[in-house]
């Protein structure tokens, strides 16, 4: 009985295995990841057909290459890499009014949480403030639509 009492008494002071919490380990290792959205405007600008005898399609002031440079520069500033990732080919359809102003746009295909990308593209287009020479049918200005395909790719980098 005395031996059991001594063993219990000394066993109370011996430490068992200690548990290490996961948070202590993960505090020392931080992961840095950079996300970049790249896009290509290599596809030619396409015009929806006007149904008239002698159509003249809408043109961006400065031409197609200046339009692509401007939209590329504006999208670089407005696409938010922290909120979403985007991959694949999208169609940006621009609706040009009779007065040569951008009336609205449409981004296809529609994807889940695509409203964030649409918001950023809208901000880029507003900031670009595009001026167009309106389309005409037999010398009369008409509404027109222009389609530009954009190929998006999201890349992640470890720093």
Model-flagged regions — what are they?
Residues 3-13:
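Sec-dependent N-terminal signal peptides
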Residues 17-159:
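Charge-biased low-complexity segments
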């Amino acid at each position: 009985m005395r031996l059991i009492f001594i063993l219990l008494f000394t066993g109370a002071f011996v430490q068992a295995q200690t548990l290490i919490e996961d948070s202590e380990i993960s505090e020392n290792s931080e992961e840095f990841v950079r996300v970049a959205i790249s896009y290509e405007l290599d596809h030619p600008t396409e015009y929806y057909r006007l149904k008239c005898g002698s159509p003249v399609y809408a043109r961006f002031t400065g031409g197609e290459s200046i339009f692509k440079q401007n939209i590329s520069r504006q999208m670089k500033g407005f696409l938010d890499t922290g909120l979403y990732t985007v991959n694949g080919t999208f169609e940006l359809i621009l609706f040009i009014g009779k007065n040569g102003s951008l009336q609205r746009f449409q981004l296809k295909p529609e994807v889940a949480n695509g409203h964030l990308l649409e918001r950023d593209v809208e901000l880029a287009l507003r900031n670009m403030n595009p001026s167009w020479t309106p389309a005409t049918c037999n010398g009369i200005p008409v509404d027109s639509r222009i389609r530009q395909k954009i190929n998006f790719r999201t890349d992640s980098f470890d720093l």
